[in-house]
């Protein structure tokens, strides 16, 4: 059985299940690297995968948690409604575009709700670390009001339909998969820096199907 939920729901559910001693997942796989590693610190079973030699050193943590993907964080935009010349190629360009056309972008920019999405919170923290002008950039981006969501799917739907025009800090893997069959959805990577995440996976110490969990992780 595979349960798909956002990173905050995953964290809270796993913590609750461990505290109650009830049935829980054999494997945890989270896009929120910080909360994923927090769970691994407290609950991961040590397992040296035979595939470990195929991974870069940074993707292995104490033979317990593994970074399983390499996913850039991107902007998305509506190709029908955003002229090619306006497509932002940096966070600064995005902020400048929105600040210069506040009427057009009023409530038309979407991103993660950092109160409900652990991934969204993590990306905001990393933006702050990477961008010395983070708070000014954020203030300009938010001038017309932000439409926030707890997961990537609704953001892509809203941008594709035109309900929103631009999405900030979306996972490139989801955006690329959607854009292959959605002519309205465009993708742009910021040139001054691009955040990259790796989904964290580990086997629970309380796994009831340990062999199957090892095979799945491998």
What label would you give each PLM region?
Residues 3-11, 15, 23-163:
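Extracytoplasmic ligand-binding site segments that recognize negatively charged/polar headgroups
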Residues 18, 126, 178-181:
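Active-site catalytic pocket residues across diverse enzymes, especially alpha/beta-hydrolases
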Residues 19-20, 46-47, 184-186:
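Short, hinge-like loop/turn segments at secondary-structure boundaries
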Residues 84, 119, 175-178, 195-198:
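Short acidic/glycine-rich loop or secondary-structure boundary segments that cap or lie
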Residues 153-161, 165, 179-218:
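Extracytoplasmic/periplasmic substrate-recognition and gating elements
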Residues 171-172:
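Glycine-rich, charged/polar anion/phosphate-binding loops
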């Amino acid at each position: 059985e595979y349960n798909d939920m956002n990173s905050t729901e995953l964290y809270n559910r796993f913590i609750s299940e461990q505290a109650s001693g009830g049935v829980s997942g054999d494997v945890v796989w989270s896009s929120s690297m910080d909360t994923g590693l927090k769970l691994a610190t407290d609950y991961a079973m040590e397992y040296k995968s035979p595939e470990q030699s195929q991974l870069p050193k940074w993707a292995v943590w104490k033979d317990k948690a593994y970074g399983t993907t390499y996913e850039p964080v991107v902007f998305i935009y509506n190709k029908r409604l955003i002229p090619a010349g306006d497509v932002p190629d940096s966070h600064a360009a995005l902020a400048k575009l929105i600040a210069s056309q506040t009427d057009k972008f009023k409530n038309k920019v979407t991103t993660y709700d950092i109160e409900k999405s652990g991934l969204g919170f993590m990306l905001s923290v990393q933006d702050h670390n990477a961008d010395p002008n983070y708070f000014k950039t954020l203030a300009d981006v938010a001038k017309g009001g932000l439409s926030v969501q707890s997961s990537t799917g609704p953001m892509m739907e809203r941008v594709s339909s035109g309900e929103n025009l631009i999405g900030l800090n979306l996972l490139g893997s989801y955006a690329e998969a959607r854009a292959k069959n959605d002519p309205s959805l465009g993708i742009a990577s910021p040139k001054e820096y691009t955040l990259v995440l790796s989904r964290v996976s580990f086997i629970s110490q309380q796994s009831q199907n340990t062999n199957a969990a090892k095979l799945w992780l491998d």
